[in-house]
């Protein structure tokens, strides 16, 4: 369902087709089951709209309210919910079987930063030429990365070979 169709989900005033409705007042108080004509008269008297809140109920539930204000509140709620969502990104760090300690520490520091920021990390180990014959060296390096990141992340996908590279996914630890 599109956002526009979802917004027009609630029928108002003349769009309501039921003969009898359960009416709720402006402050949320129950008025009771009344005819549609009575409810429309009450809405006009109070200078508000009659909005169908629950069309599937028997009888349908309608509320006296300012529809413009209602739409604004709904869009505000949607906007806040969207802001609270955090988009998890996957950051990638590439290693080689011959990565020295200095480079290893820099890459490890970046991995720790990614995981503490809440992002997932993809650790890629690239083999070139004859290095493919020594996959055990690469596996040992990935095991070392896993051990060094044990306190900030958990391995989501264990090392597996994809063509000429080994890939391992690490997710941040839940707080």
Swiss-Prot record:
Record carries keyword Nucleotide-binding: no
GO CC terms: cytosol; membrane
Its localization reads:
Cytoplasm
Protein family membership: Belongs to the IF-3 family.
**A Pfam family recorded for this sequence:** IF3_C
Q: Principal place where this protein is found?
A: cytoplasm
Biological-process GO terms, alphabetical: ribosome disassembly
> What's the name of its gene?
infC
Q: Which InterPro entries does its entry note?
A: T_IF-3_C_sf, T_IF-3_N_sf, Translation_initiation_fac3_CS, Translation_initiation_fac_3, Translation_initiation_fac_3_C, Translation_initiation_fac_3_N
Protein's UniProt name: Translation initiation factor IF-3
What PROSITE patterns does UniProt report for this protein, alphabetically? IF3 (PS00938)
What are the entry keywords? Cytoplasm, Initiation factor, Protein biosynthesis
